[in-house]
Structures are given as C-alpha cells and as structure tokens.
Amino acid sequence: MSEFVTVARPYAKAAFDFAVEHQSLDRWQDMLAFAADVTRNEQISELLAGAVAPETLSRTFIAVCGEQLDEHGQNFIRVMAENGRLLVLPAVLQQFIELRALLESTVEVEVLSASALNDKQLANIAAAMEKRLSRKVKLNCKIDKSVLAGVIIRAGDMVIDGSVRGRLERLTDVLQS
C-alpha cells in the first residue's frame, strides 16, 4: 500500500494543482471519489489487472464513469491509463483529500467512543483538538463498543487513548512487568 501512496502522490498533486487553479476542488474531489469507487468494482479491478491496451482501458473506464467525469477528468483518466496507474485511484483520492485539508488548514480527527457523544461533548473535543493542533478540525465520529467507555482520538499519527479499554491494557502491562 505504501508503494501506491508513492505512485499516487504526483497524480494527486497534479489534479490538486489543476483544481485549485480552476477553483474546482469540490468537483475534482467528487470525480476522484467516483473513479476510485469504480476501481473497487470487482469486474473493473479484474480488467485493470489484466493485459488490456491502455486506449481500450481508458475508453472502457470513461464509459463506465459516464457523465461523472468532465473533459479534464477524462483526460486525467487517460493519462493514468496510459501509465498503467488506474488501480492507484483510491490512493490518489486520499492524497488529494490530504492536500485539500492542508490548503484549508483543517485536519480530520477520528473519535472512537462506546456510545454516541452529545453536541457539547463533540464541541469540547473539537475545541481542545483545535487548540492542541493549531488548526481547524473536522470530527469523524465512530462508535466502537470495545472502547467500553471514554474516547480514543486519532489525528494523523497522534493517538490520545482516554478509553477504559486502554487504561485496562496499560494496567495489565504494569502488573505483568
């Protein structure tokens, strides 16, 4: 997967720069998301992995995407097909989203909790994370019963484990050492 990220980076950067220049970030993100979903289709991924001529591949892929791709999006798909890189479209999308977050000075923060959090709790978490990261945050809340109670917060490579499960694991480690 890390090789996909490396391969995807220049494509994501090119798409991102074009989208910024033409003030079409939303449109490009939507096109990339749709194209990435198409690559996840079992029949399409088999076609992409097979020995198919790039022209045929790009024509087929663009036909499947239909009107979801504008002219520039179709050209982008053609270039990726010519270079045999359509399978990395999900990684291109992820890189594009990360570049957009940097531009907009936001960071996506994942919040795992055992049950749904109320608006006040979410506001407190958002405020604390914005202060700590010095950036705007976008909370992505998920419910995970294995947390037991408390929350686990992830932002990039930073993890704050305030869960009962985490405390029990740390206590177990201390008792076993």
From Swiss-Prot:
PROSITE patterns: ATPASE_DELTA (PS00389). It comes from the Bacteria. GO terms for molecular function: proton-transporting ATP synthase activity, rotational mechanism. It is a peripheral membrane protein. Keywords: ATP synthesis, Cell inner membrane, Cell membrane, CF(1), Hydrogen ion transport, Ion transport, Membrane, Transport. Pfam families: OSCP. One of its GO terms (cellular component) is proton-transporting ATP synthase complex. It is found in: Cell inner membrane. Gene3D superfamilies: N-terminal domain of the delta subunit of the F1F0-ATP synthase. Its main location: membrane. Belongs to the ATPase delta chain family. NCBIfam families: ATP_synt_delta (TIGR01145), PRK05758.2-2 (NF004402), PRK05758.2-5 (NF004404). F-type ATPases have 2 components, F(1) - the catalytic core - and F(0) - the membrane proton channel. F(1) has five subunits: alpha(3), beta(3), gamma(1), delta(1), epsilon(1). F(0) has three main subunits: a(1), b(2) and c(10-14). The alpha and beta chains form an alternating ring which encloses part of the gamma chain. F(1) is attached to F(0) by a central stalk formed by the gamma and epsilon chains, while a peripheral stalk is formed by the delta and b chains. F(1)F(0) ATP synthase produces ATP from ADP in the presence of a proton or sodium gradient. F-type ATPases consist of two structural domains, F(1) containing the extramembraneous catalytic core and F(0) containing the membrane proton channel, linked together by a central stalk and a peripheral stalk. During catalysis, ATP synthesis in the catalytic domain of F(1) is coupled via a rotary mechanism of the central stalk subunits to proton translocation. This protein is part of the stalk that links CF(0) to CF(1). It either transmits conformational changes from CF(0) to CF(1) or is implicated in proton conduction. This is ATP synthase subunit delta. The lineage of its organism: Bacteria, Pseudomonadati, Pseudomonadota, Gammaproteobacteria, Enterobacterales. The gene is atpH.
